[in-house]
Amino acid sequence: MSQRGLEALLRPKSIAVIGASMKPNRAGYLMMRNLLAGGFNGPVLPVTPAWKAVLGVLAWPDIASLPFTPDLAVLCTNASRNLALLEELGEKGCKTCIILSAPASQHEDLRACALRHNMRLLGPNSLGLLAPWQGLNASFSPVPIKRGKLAFISQSAAVSNTILDWAQQRKMGFSYFIALGDSLDIDVDELLDYLARDSKTSAILLYLEQLSDARRFVSAARSASRNKPILVIKSGRSPAAQRLLNTTAGMDPAWDAAIQRAGLLRVQDTHELFSAVETLSHMRPLRGDRLMIISNGAAPAALALDALWSRNGKLATLSEETCQKLRDALPGHVAISNPLDLRDDASSEHYIKTLDILLHSQDFDALMVIHSPSAAAPATESAQVLIEAVKHHPRSKYVSLLTNWCGEHSSQEARRLFSEAGLPTYRTPEGTITAFMHMVEYRRNQKQLRETPALPSNLTSNTAEAHLLLQQAIAEGATSLDTHEVQPILQAYGMNTLPTRIASDSTEAVHIAEQIGYPVALKLRSPDIPHKSEVQGVMLYLRTANEVQQAANAIFDRVKMAWPQARVHGLLVQSMANRAGAQELRVVVEHDPVFGPLIMLGEGGVEWRPEDQAVVALPPLNMNLARYLVIQGIKSKKIRARSALRPLDVAGLSQLLVQVSNLIVDCPEIQRLDIHPLLASGSEFTALDVTLDISPFEGDNESRLAVRPYPHQLEEWVELKNGERCLFRPILPEDEPQLQQFISRVTKEDLYYRYFSEINEFTHEDLANMTQIDYDREMAFVAVRRIDQTEEILGVTRAISDPDNIDAEFAVLVRSDLKGLGLGRRLMEKLITYTRDHGLQRLNGITMPNNRGMVALARKLGFNVDIQLEEGIVGLTLNLAQREES
């Protein structure tokens, strides 16, 4: 997430073209031509011994002879010279370099050279970059691009050229257009951090094929998407496509889970990609999800309705007042409804009257205008009239407008006019609905991610016991555990299992059945037979000793006949669950090569295909995230909403998924977990059959996860001056109600000192931003007092680090009636220790000169205090490295 050098790449003050040429079609010629034609304001320095000047610009024979050090260099020479030239640029002090081509054999040497000289690299095999607001075209793009508010980051030069060509025809602009190439150094997460703060960028579109660091990507994407919509198209969904692209991209459902967890939206194909570009370039942010449709034909409106229905969209309902105004304005044969079919004889005037009435109403959030070729309302004329009406209507800025001028030849000019006017326009009704639903789903994802999670009830975990059991199994050489062996591990995390024992033969099976009680089930134990059903290896509802003995012998006999070489480790004898009216589910944890552990929920089957049969989420899960997974499974028909007798207990299943998540997060030894079946019967969820694959684990437990989990190890009990003990711990999303209550007990004066303004009330969004933090980028510690199973917050301190993890901004707030207990100092000491251990160099903050308590505390803690009376602030800076030495 480093931002080092990105300013020199994306806003360079000078550029050197190494290998500049006067020969057309040479890379050095094309790069010089594009840089000069783009209108770059700074010096462009062609470097070539072959020419005195290139395109009228004085050339320099080599890098050493350059009159000053360029911010950015572009290597346009033969790839064999890359390493030597990069070394020269590094010695010259160049900050960034674009490498247009390099074989894989050079990658490690190029990376090492750049690191040695503190230089950043874009590429290799990069098309380059375009930054129209800087007049920068450091690319091979054959077409120029206009200024716009959309940033595009691509890992494919071919896709980049396609989008550029399409955008030129639509006269569509970009803030940045960056082709990453092989991402040897600069990667997508760093660019997301940069673009999130860029004032010229209002939306971001990504084309991705692979990731080098899933954790950094999810963290950066989650941060950026809180302020700007980000859409992703990901290729390589099939194994064949991954082989073609030569990538190890991981499981496609894992990408869906990561994209959703980060608050992004995925588009599935090139058609959706073009619609997404149109939408992000021109469409206003949605206020809600209610859509109003007007058309001059029933059939196009019906196609739009079908597309809306298939994506679970929502039609607006018109008020009676709006309906009456439309009846008064339109011919009597027009039925007032939504969609509003103006009929094929509708004139441009009918469109404008309808538009005016609808824009004055508040019955919808987005308006879709469909126009089919018509003699009564020619396409171009209707578009011109509509554009003027929208331009001058006082309420047009409050509504998201989408236009769909059907047809090709007759509507081409109309679509050009809409693009020039900044109104999103699409070729088909279905494409328009797709674009609308992109923004609805993005808005919905963001809203869901900010909801306050419920506190799960009776959530227990015994991490130490689970670790001990796993370590014992590994020490004994086990690599896979079955239901009997996994039972105590699941129970340590509060999950229900049935009494299960191992029998070596039919006689022992009868003995165990007598002990645990009838009816029982018998299940084959064999590592060589993946599906017990292949040999009828599961026998249910055995009610007598005779039935148990016969069933056991029959299982052994079938194995000998069908799988004579199979190893048999006896039978599992298990109490028979009451399956009447119950529902069978499957919960699987797989390890993805890119995103780490994945939690999958479905109904299973012999042939388990997660992409078709399961919904997927990244751990860690809280109750909200688990609930979304369950609801997603129901909506996508991966699981049923009810069994024959009763509905599925969504809250109960969500809690079980949280328990599974906690187990996986706490126990890195677990490689795979398969609970199948999981029996859902009312509020009871029971694991009937479980397989657990394990292996030794060394290293950082958290590093294997794509999302950093809650850091339990930072919890600490602290005794205050009055002898009271309170818990210092990282903040949780579930803390929102307690945080709101805490703020209500802070005086207005103290809040003013903290926020530099009078704040009457914090919104849910404000509180969500304070509690739902990314522990990789931010840390907030709360001091908590526990009273009768409830918690109240006494104080909060937080630090937000920059993307380079060098500086962090800090703040501290203590309940006004609890000052003098040393709470603020203890919280600050904990924050200082954490930020220093986290590798930060400086801790910065500001307060007001009359906040004497904070100024005095800062001095005691070793901060440099800079009182700026003219500005009315006090700057506070702590050098963490110096403090550690002292």
Feature names for model-found ranges:
Residues L522, V573, L692, A783, ...:
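Short beta-strand element of the conserved SAM-dependent methyltransferase core
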Residues M1-D689, F697:
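Catalytic-core regions of core metabolic enzymes
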Residues F697-S886:
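Long, contiguous binding/interaction regions
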